[in-house]
């Protein structure tokens, strides 16, 4: 009888730690339905599966990553569950797309930004509203929120029906340089994650937001081959460094030059 109790307790402990390990790989929870009104989903017309995220910054413009560019992009706004459609969901397509570099020649580590002008403005609603551009760069150690419909497992491609959110920290750029040997000495890129691992953006989160104090500070760019690994934080395009370019394009200067 005692042996049975011991075995039962061991089984409970094993299940508990297995669950905690799984939580570390997943690294986040379902976003509150009202906390991501600026989060958009990028699809292609040929596929029903979203391939990237994006960020609504005003009624007519969306930010995403250059690596997310496709020929036939469809942009869904106001979505939470991919299975249950909100009444105020709106769909748009790009009218114009702007890049710091060609979407095919952006460097692996830099210039990963795309600015999309929608074919028609969207209306603010219960589940749709733009996010503020940054007034200052994020401080080292800031707790920021990353979100998206990307895969929630580091070992297999498992996409959730709803966006997941996780809190991560702004880390010193040297941490990412140590993790990625080819990362240049200077870059307009944010390094963000959890040093011990367990929370991270992952496949199909690219182009989505990194929100710090209610402002869009980063665009999900890339990370390690396996998400959420210790000392392998993610890389995020630094929005603050591209503010002049973004504002110039929106103001009508289509020849605006990105920062070097």
Swiss-Prot record:
Expressed by the venom gland. PANTHER family: KALLIKREIN-1, KALLIKREIN-RELATED. The keyword Cytoplasm does not apply. This is Snake venom serine protease 2. Residues 25-251 form the Peptidase S1 domain. It is found in: Secreted. One of its GO terms (molecular function) is toxin activity. Its EC number is 3.4.21.-. One of its GO terms (biological process) is proteolysis. Pfam families: Trypsin (PF00089). Disulfide bonds join 31-165, 52-68, 100-258, 144-212, 176-191, 202-227. Monomer. InterPro entries: Peptidase_S1_PA, Peptidase_S1_PA_chymotrypsin, Peptidase_S1A, Trypsin_dom. Glycans are attached at residues 123-124. It is an enzyme of class 3 (hydrolase). It comes from Protobothrops flavoviridis. SUPFAM superfamilies: Trypsin-like serine proteases. Residues 19-24 form a propeptide. Belongs to the peptidase S1 family. Snake venom subfamily. The keyword Disulfide bond applies. Residues 1-18 form the signal peptide. Snake venom serine protease that may act in the hemostasis system of the prey. GO terms for cellular component: extracellular region; secretory granule. Keywords: Disulfide bond, Glycoprotein, Hemostasis impairing toxin, Hydrolase, Protease, Secreted, Serine protease, Signal, Toxin, Zymogen.
